[in-house]
Amino acid sequence: MARDRRDYYYRQAKEEGYRSRASFKLKQINERHHIINRGDSVVDLGAAPGGWLQVAKELSGGKVLGVDLQRIVPIEGVETIQGNINADSTIQKIIKTVGAKGADVVLCDAAPNLSGNWSYDHARSIELATSALECAKKILKPKGNFVVKVFQGDMFNDYMQKVRDNFVRTMAYSPKASRSQSAEIYVIGKKFLTAPLRKGDKFVVDIEKLGSSGDGAVLIEGFVVFVKEVEVGEKVRIKITDVKPNFAFADVAERLGKTEKPE
């Protein structure tokens, strides 16, 4: 506590009426990466005591919802749910509150109770962040944004890849308000993908037409995929190389011959 009293952001939080010094982390993340826009609906997972909820409400002015296993002391203009984000009943309550279209932004600044065993604490942090990601995938709007805190360690890169698989842009960021000795870092996903495919997926397709750029253009579950270096009439096995909100790119993994024409 003595260290906290000497901490600049701790003092600033007290002076400005925020519930925790973590409020300044979200402010700095948003200043740099523009996660929350005016009018956005925001869901904060693991929100107690509510420092991020206060900032989210200031930034968006829209619907803000906090979810936590603990009761969150009320904040004006903010709704709360006491529940487990892994439970279907909690997901249903979130959707009922923010609406069927989903939230514009999902945040999670939660951390596990520290044991002092770093490998264990890192694994618990990744587990918690994975739960937050799975929840976000169920409640985010298409092109929505996601921010989650994790502890750095040997499982970090695998977790980053999971986020990359679901967002157009992904980055890691450490705000100035994080303590210098802290191993925490924030993973940011921008523009949530709702496509029926992901990078690395493979499909067998018939090339029936070319797009304006000369690439093959095929539909997979109604989603446009552009395939490089193909000709009309080819049957190919493709591998998805990049996914955007409205289309994807693919390379040829195997040429399977010509498309069979009906007699």
Curated annotation (Swiss-Prot):
GO CC aspect terms: cytoplasm
Gene3D superfamilies attached to this UniProt entry: Nucleic acid-binding proteins (2.40.50.140), Vaccinia Virus protein VP39 (3.40.50.150)
Listed name of the protein: Ribosomal RNA large subunit methyltransferase E
Compartments, record wording: Cytoplasm
HAMAP family named among the record's database cross-references: RNA_methyltr_E
SUPFAM superfamilies associated with the record: Nucleic acid-binding proteins (SSF50249), S-adenosyl-L-methionine-dependent methyltransferases (SSF53335)
A Pfam family reported for this protein in Swiss-Prot or TrEMBL: FtsJ
Enzyme Commission number, as recorded: 2.1.1.166
Gene Ontology molecular function, alphabetical: rRNA (uridine-2'-O-)-methyltransferase activity
Record PROSITE patterns: TRAM
UniProt function note: Specifically methylates the uridine in position 2552 of 23S rRNA at the 2'-O position of the ribose in the fully assembled 50S ribosomal subunit.
Alphabetical keyword list: Cytoplasm, Methyltransferase, rRNA processing, S-adenosyl-L-methionine, Transferase
Protein family per UniProt: Belongs to the class I-like SAM-binding methyltransferase superfamily. RNA methyltransferase RlmE family.
Residue positions of the active site: K149
InterPro entries given in the database record: NA-bd_OB-fold (IPR012340), RNA_methyltr_RlmE (IPR050082), RNA_MeTrfase_FtsJ_dom (IPR002877), rRNA-MeTfrase_E (IPR015507), SAM-dependent_MTases_sf (IPR029063), TRAM_dom (IPR002792)
Binding site for S-adenosyl-L-methionine: G50, W52, D68, N84, D109
Catalysed reactions, as listed in the record: uridine(2552) in 23S rRNA + S-adenosyl-L-methionine = 2'-O-methyluridine(2552) in 23S rRNA + S-adenosyl-L-homocysteine + H(+)
Span of domain TRAM: 196-254
